[in-house]
Amino acid sequence: MHDNYDVLIIGGGPGGYVAAIRAGQLGLRTALVEKQHLGGICLNWGCIPTKALLHGAEVAHSITHASQLGISVGEVNVDLQKLVQFSRAVSQQLTGGVEYLLKKNGVRVIDGTARLRGKGQITVADARGEEYDYRADHVILATGARPRALPGIAPDGEYIWTYYEALQPKRLPRSLLIIGSGAIGVEFASLYNDLGCKVTLVELASQILPVEDAEVSAAVRKSFEKRGIQVHTQTQVTQVQLTDTGVRCTMKNTSAESFLEVERVLLAVGVQPNIEDLGLEALGVELDRGFIKTDTACRTNVFGLYAIGDVAGPPCLAHKASHEGVICIETLAGVEGTHPLDRDCVPGCTYSRPQVASLGLTESTALARGRPVRIGKFSYQSNGKALASGETEGFVKTIFDAETGELLGAHMVGAQVTEQIQGFGIARHLEATDESLLSMIFAHPTLSEAMHESILAACDQPLHQ
């Protein structure tokens, strides 16, 4: 088997495997090196298994509250291990599908750990430590990222968790403190609360979900606190100590220090790129805050070397990584009409209860950039489908440029908003204005009508409020 390739990709996550498939489709001799599992964090320990667990928890919640619809049920019991097994089975099914697609498109998968030993030169060590050399005209780094630790608070796999342990608990802890309230922290807070765990959520910033619009963040916090989740913002966990029953945590906010004892602690303070032992230093690869620096076509400062996905910097999202994989391959293959990534068109989704979805600028960011804005907002409480479904918690908020009509941002909180945000993504991608969106017809009754009503409100033409 040949050891020279047009493209060699290091890392088989959503960025790497999609890049490999596209390269194979374009007729490029392609190899993919993966040291653990095809599908990366997303399919194995992130996006997919968390959604399976969240689905189970939400079903349990719906059954528990079915009496509101006149449906009587007995006591609801969740077999945690069966739920975990279901999530693992879903992941395995999808990773098997990735393996099939790579084979179908002529991609050679190499098991092992890769490092660069020169321009276009790669050495791969297999599980036995034996090394093999390869050459490629183009090398793509798609090595992803891993959970970040805090000084003095290191995961131990038993009492102090990362998402690895949180996805496959041996038993449900009675209490859980989550450090960090980004998408990962908020999703696990929602999950464990629905399963019956007492959850405390701690965030250093002034709001949970710090990257989201302030109104959306406030709505999620209000919902969480109503459910019994304790939320502390502008608070830092300064120390953890193991006890006979769990972990004693020292927390400090702007005015005081407090203590909390819990059975488990989950670190959800972001990720750090996997750049160690790749050989970047010897090649002089430029970094930006620890991430590999790239241009709009995913090229590094070293000719023939590219980086995509989490290792190339935020937003650390699977769909952004996959899109970069396609952009990278089509650029190096000379495909006409390839467009660079528009970061303002990258949707963000948080699958908590209530769900959160957004794209583009928040209100505060738009104002900080000096954009004149017109804002529309519509509540689920006035939406017929939401009322019929008993899902009245939430709203849709749209932000337009007051002068040009450009859609600057869309922010949604509530049931199924992660399935609706694509509508705003299409609108922004096609450069639709408020005027053109006004004339769209939305099916009735649907939750998506709240999208249209928010646009109408932004244009001072509200119909149902």
Describe these PLM feature segments.
Residues G11-G16, G144, G180-G185, G270, ...:
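Conserved phosphate-binding and hydrolysis motifs of nucleotide-dependent enzymes
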Residues L8-G15, A19, G24-Q36, I41, ...:
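Flexible, glycine-rich terminal cap/loop adjacent to redox cofactors
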Residues H2-G13, L172-G182:
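Beta1/beta-strand and adjacent pyrophosphate-binding region of the FAD-binding site
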Residues C47, T143-K198, V202, V231, ...:
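Glycine-rich dinucleotide-binding loop and its adjacent helix/turn
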Residues H2-Y5, I21-L28, V33-L172, T200, ...:
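Glycine-rich flavin
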Residues G74, R108-D111, R115-A127, L195-T296, ...:
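A Rossmann-like FAD-binding core segment of flavoenzymes
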